[in-house]
A protein has these predicted regions:
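Short, surface-exposed loop/helix-turn segments at secondary-structure junctions
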Residues: 44-50
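Metal-dependent nuclease catalytic regions and adjoining charged, substrate-binding loops involved
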Residues: 52, 57, 62-155
């Protein structure tokens, strides 16, 4: 499985929408996505759930659809390499593979989502989207969290 491309954008039209994906890496049979996640330091059950809840599985199905539409019909699987943001990363790394069947099921769900999006794209009306932007700041606890860790380490 020789690598075909790293971080190459693919574009295609599907279900009446213009689509784009940017796999981190892909071969002729598999796409890959590198994730940095605090969930990599937890058990596999938690990580499996997070892969679903965070949309990583859906992203894999989307990438596969794009690669297939761009002349790579044999791309069947999607692999996630999930690494914890804090060391030791070599101990906290998971390599997860989404089966072709899993991606097929998710693709069916995404097809209905895309079809529901077409009227929104055509009219410019997106239900539930606010008209005003909410300005947010970095939480104070996040600003002091690293300082607290440094104080503990220095003691």
């Amino acid at each position: 499985q020789d690598a075909v491309a790293a971080e190459a954008s693919v574009f295609w039209a599907q279900d009446g929408l213009k689509c784009k994906a940017r796999p981190d890496w892909f071969t002729r049979t598999c796409s890959y996505d590198l994730k940095i996640s605090v969930h990599a330091s937890k058990d596999i059950g938690t990580l499996r759930y997070r892969a679903w809840a965070e949309g990583w599985m859906h992203q894999g199905a989307h990438v596969r659809a794009g690669l297939r539409a761009n002349g790579f019909p044999d791309v069947a699987k999607h692999r996630l390499v999930v690494i914890a943001p804090k060391g030791p990363s070599s101990v906290q790394t998971y390599c997860l593979e989404l089966s072709e069947h899993t991606l097929d099921v998710i693709e069916l769900e995404m097809e209905s989502i895309r079809k529901a999006m077409v009227p929104c794209v055509e009219t410019g009306i997106w239900p539930g989207t606010p008209d005003d932007w909410e300005t947010i700041e970095i939480p104070e606890s996040a600003l002091t969290a690293d300082l607290d860790e440094e104080e503990v380490a220095g003691e």
